[in-house]
């Protein structure tokens, strides 16, 4: 079997109207890249059954024996009248729909748990628990609606998943990716990635990519995605040694600024070393705490946070000295240091992250411009580290840059002490 031409389709009028962003397609494309597949095309369609049907027919016609097509579609599997995916796929295949036994059991349990009568809502529920006849079912372990895979000809398959990101990601990782790997043989591909902190895509391409013969010659497929505070660099090749060489070179050139996925690795470190953490946040307004608590099991290491937006909270709860605030200001290295040390005491933790800055658009001065931010990394019975950064971006972007940087700074300190 040849490697397929993969096309991702996202459905939803909220996407085509601009009311919501399509994050599913980029997530799926990244996951596929990690298992050795590349995406040829991304398509966004409204909740219009005729438009969806026409697009699918066009894409099906592209398939040949040497160029099989895999279509991956998200959205349109819900209970409402504008969820058309099941209807369209059944029409395209000329088959009826059947209930998924597993999905019916899940929805009955769902209604029972909430004291609702399943029979009274049967017609609505049926839309969510049905799949095309003779399809491969992708079970939904997070929500209700199952996904499914159907053959649309000898050389083309269509996989459909819910549009809800949490349901889709679990379904793809647990079931769909396994099916793809079994169905399509690929050359053995090796991949790896790094986060490079405080680096732009263009700067990285100029400094690194343009000078690497293995990349410019096409021996290695590379990709870079800009995030708030870092870029994610990935390499893929059928030669493991080439990927390892490039990753090692990144680590040598960029040192501690070259990391694995900090947001995955930091929780592992905290759990492994049985370390507890707390936060003292001003300009980020609790965003660092959110990043910690987004991870399942974070209660084992994250004790809590203080949102010290007002100076009175900095003084009253964190113990920042009045003279410090008066002499140096709320946005200062000195205040960040005392915030971090106060969080250690107030929360009874081993480590703390503090952040204070000017998110804008107002509040800046010639001496302290909008975008200036200070961090403190506190450690019980040890000297507190302080860091200064400057993120001259819109308010929401500034907050994300600052929050991500705070997580990185704690990770970096723990790695240095390991």
From Swiss-Prot:
Highest taxon of the lineage: Bacteria
Which lineage ranks, top first, belong to the organism behind this chain?
Bacteria, Pseudomonadati, Spirochaetota, Spirochaetia, Leptospirales
Q: Which protein are we looking at?
A: CinA-like protein
Question: What family is it from?
Answer: Belongs to the CinA family.
Matching InterPro entries: CinA, CinA-like_C, CinA_C, Competence-induced_CinA, MoaB/Mog-like_dom_sf, MoaB/Mog_dom
């Amino acid at each position: 079997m040849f490697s397929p031409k993969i096309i991702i389709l996202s459905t939803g009028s909220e996407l085509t109207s601009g009311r919501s962003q399509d994050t599913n397609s980029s997530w799926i494309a990244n996951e596929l890249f990690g298992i050795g597949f590349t995406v040829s095309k991304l398509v966004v369609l409204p909740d219009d059954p005729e438009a969806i049907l026409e697009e699918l027919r066009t894409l099906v016609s592209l398939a040949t024996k040497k160029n099989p097509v895999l279509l991956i579609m998200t959205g349109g599997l819900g209970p409402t009248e504008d969820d058309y995916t099941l209807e369209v796929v059944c029409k395209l295949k000329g088959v009826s729909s059947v209930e998924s036994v597993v999905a019916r059991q899940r929805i009955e349990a769902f209604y029972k748990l909430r004291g609702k009568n399943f029979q009274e809502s049967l017609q609505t529920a049926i839309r969510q628990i049905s799949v095309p006849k003779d399809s491969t079912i992708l079970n939904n372990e997070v929500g209700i609606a199952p996904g499914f895979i159907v053959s649309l000809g000898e050389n083309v398959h269509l996989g459909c998943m819910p549009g809800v990101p949490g349901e889709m990601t679990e379904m793809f990782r647990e079931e769909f990716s396994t099916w793809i790997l079994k169905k399509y043989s690929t050359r053995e591909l090796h991949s790896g990635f790094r986060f490079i902190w405080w680096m732009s895509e263009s700067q990285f391409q100029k400094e690194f990519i343009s000078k690497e013969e293995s990349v410019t010659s096409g021996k290695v497929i590379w990709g870079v995605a800009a995030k708030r505070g870092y870029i994610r660099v990935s390499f893929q090749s059928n030669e493991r040694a080439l990927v390892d060489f490039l990753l090692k070179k990144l680590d040598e050139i960029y040192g501690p600024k070259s990391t694995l996925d900090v947001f995955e690795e930091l929780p592992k470190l905290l759990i492994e070393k049985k370390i507890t953490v707390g936060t003292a946040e001003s300009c980020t307004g609790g965003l660092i705490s959110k990043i910690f608590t987004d991870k399942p099991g974070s209660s084992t290491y994250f004790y809590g946070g203080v949102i010290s937006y007002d100076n009175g909270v900095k003084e009253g709860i964190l113990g920042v000295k009045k003279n410090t605030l008066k002499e140096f200001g709320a946005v200062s290295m000195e205040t960040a240091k005392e915030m971090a040390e106060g969080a250690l005491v107030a929360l009874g933790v081993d480590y703390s992250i503090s952040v204070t800055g000017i998110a804008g658009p107002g509040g800046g001065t010639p001496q302290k411009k909008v975008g200036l931010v200070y961090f403190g990394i506190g450690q019980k019975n040890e000297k507190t580290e302080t860091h200064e950064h400057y993120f001259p971006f819109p308010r929401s972007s500034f907050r994300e840059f600052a929050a991500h940087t705070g997580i990185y700074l704690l990770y970096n300190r723990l790695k240095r002490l390991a």
